[in-house]
A protein has these predicted regions:
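Helix-breaking motifs and short loop linkers at transmembrane-helix boundaries and internal kinks
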Residues: 45, 77, 98-104, 247, ...
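Cytoplasmic helix-loop-helix junction between adjacent transmembrane helices
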Residues: 108-149
Length: 412
């Protein structure tokens, strides 16, 4: 069994578990906002555009913070950076729980987003540093399964707590969970400093320019922007559409996340293994093309039986999540190791800003008439266009072959 410099053996499985827990809390913090929209509108007496600001505040703050962090994130031990960033995210979540008004909630979302967005980017950088290329698809599948677990457990439990007690309670519970995850990071995650030796001692702006001057890095960021826009044209408005147009009640909304989460929990790991065997670009292309069918169906769905709505929304979630796993594996492999932390921080910013732009653009397109959403089908078509662009850009991603195991990380 290998050891770190401190003499402490670290198992790859334990590390992936901690990274998945970090990702779970960050994802849940973002996901729980959308189905709580009706409650926020009633409690704060706000309109949909004001609710949209609650959502976009997180994304915009995360994007800006990620750009700033990209200037210096590669100069620090990954573990130390993770502990500091995650502590900030925990405080931001606690501030959300304590928010007494609409304005303070928006401010708290800015804090949570600023730290949470960079944290998620750092998780991907750690995976790229410690997981060999041959197993990276599987590792991405495990960590990205946090989306499914958040859907299966986090969102339904959060909605139950909000419905039975108060909308503040889910954030108090999440902040408490973050404390335990922080202890896990301190216990399990090793000191990762190998990348520092490869970072040239240069001004931060010059280092950032060095990352962005690489055409392959710019194409990779464009690829991720189109991929995120593909999903976030639709996701923020899915729950509202299901209630207003398809006929689900607010109490039935958790079933969308439960059914979709259970299936994606299984499918993402299978797709990760498939990508390792069959090739990540090939699997990405297949999953992206497959996802276009349920996108067009779900955005044009009329009033149907609950089981039909849940079946279609579940297929939509499985296909949508399935394209993320090979995409992230391709992305981490396309960046040189000494640039990976900074690049993934920039990438996290691109993801957040892209999600905000996509949600804003869809909000401009979508209308309301007679209590129903209109023009959601146009949004579905826009999602397909972004998807085709992502397939085209994926052809230009390079593979560095980087990602050998770090000393002290052993596969379980």
């Amino acid at each position: 069994m290998s050891e770190t410099k401190s003499g402490k053996a670290i198992h790859e499985g334990w590390l992936l578990g901690v990274l998945a827990a970090i990702q779970f809390t960050a994802v849940l913090d973002f996901m729980i906002i959308m189905p709580l929209g009706p409650q926020y509108m009633r409690v704060f007496h706000i309109d949909p555009s004001q609710f949209g600001l609650i959502v976009s505040a997180y994304a915009i703050a995360a994007g800006i913070a990620g750009i700033i962090a990209g200037f210096f994130i590669d100069r620090f031990d990954r573990k130390r950076a993770m502990l500091v960033l995650y502590a900030g995210f925990t405080l931001g979540t606690l501030f959300c729980a304590m928010a007494p008004s609409y304005q303070t909630l928006v401010a708290a979302r800015v804090v949570a987003g600023a730290f949470g967005g960079v944290t998620m980017g750092l998780v991907m950088a750690v995976i790229g540093d410690v997981i060999p290329e041959i197993r990276r698809g599987r590792a991405m599948g495990i960590v990205m399964s946090s989306f499914s677990v958040a859907s299966i457990c986090g969102v339904p439990i959060g909605l139950y707590l909000a419905n039975e007690m108060d909308w503040h309670i889910p954030f108090y519970a999440l902040a408490g969970l973050c404390v335990f995850v922080t202890l896990g990071v301190a216990k399990v995650m090793p000191s990762l400093r190998g990348h520092i030796d490869r970072v040239a001692q240069q001004p931060p702006a010059e280092m950032m320019a060095g990352i962005l001057k690489e055409a392959s890095n710019r194409r990779a960021l464009m690829f991720m922007a189109t991929l995120i826009c593909t999903g976030f044209c639709v996701f923020p408005f899915l729950a509202t559409y299901m209630v207003k147009n398809v006929g689900l009640t607010e109490k039935q909304l958790p079933w969308i996340y439960i059914c979709g989460g259970v299936c994606t929990l299984v499918s993402m790991n299978l797709i990760g293994r498939w990508a390792d065997r069959a090739g990540k670009r090939r699997v990405f292309t297949i999953m992206m093309l497959a996802s276009m069918i349920p996108v067009l169906i779900v955005t044009n769905l009329p009033h149907v039986a609950v089981w039909i709505a849940l079946t279609i929304s579940t297929i939509f979630m499985v296909c949508s999540s399935g394209r993320i796993v090979p995409a992230m594996a391709m992305l981490t492999a396309s960046v040189e190791p000494h640039q990976r932390g900074g690049f993934m921080s920039i990438n996290s910013s691109v993801q957040q800003l892209s999600s905000g732009v996509a949600a804003w653009l869809s909000g401009v397109i979508i209308g309301q008439s007679g209590g129903h959403m209109t023009r959601f089908g146009i949004v579905g078509g826009l999602s397909v266009i972004f998807g085709l662009a992502a397939i085209y850009l994926a052809r230009f991603l390079k593979t560095t072959g980087a990602g050998t195991a770090v000393q002290g990380i052993v596969e379980t």
